[in-house]
Amino acid sequence: RERLKEYYDLGARFTKWRAVYKIGNKFPSSQSIKSNAHALARYAALVQEAKMVPIVEPEVLMDGSHDIDKCYQVTTDVLNECYNELLIHKVDLKGTVLKPNMIIPGSECTKKSNADEIAQKTLDCLKKNVPSEVTGIAFLSGGQTEIEASKNLNQINKINDTNFLITFSYGRGLQASALKEFGKNQNNSGGIQKAFNHRAKMNGLSSKGAWSENLEKEATA
């Protein structure tokens, strides 16, 4: 509570807590899912008590050879438990932002999925497991390439028939190109800024379902 008050006094209005779930033969276990959900809910309740907005981030990692259906199943279990705990802790869901993973196959899975399948399964998972009171959903990129992250977000928004406002909260999906330019020449501030601005623009369009591969090509031509 003391730290939250300090952050508020410094001007913070949003906070984030991340719980990580790795898919394997015996994990995540039901106990780890429950323990992480409890921690996320306790955090969210304390943050709202401190008059800030909690960003709740339960991330099912891409690491592994699992297929898209396994990701769907684990994400379903994770989201269900998270919202059970959030309700137990009397968190006002309207005052939260969910930062989830998309439903995608593991990075080592031999069976790849296209953007249509990813979007359909992701939106279906959200509809079935996220209460309608949650209006803000900001996806993490989770190891996807920049183009994949933009393309999949765009497709999700194109078929979004819910009240969810779906946007992005990317790390690598927003910064990778800029960091690459920085690695080439740290003094090239213009090139670094241009790379960052481009990805911000592309992801902004994806948040409206207005991104296209042609826009990517035009911008880099």
Placement of each model-derived feature along the sequence:
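Active-site capping/gating regions of soluble enzymes
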Residues: 66-221
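Helix-rich catalytic cores of soluble enzyme domains
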Residues: 1-86
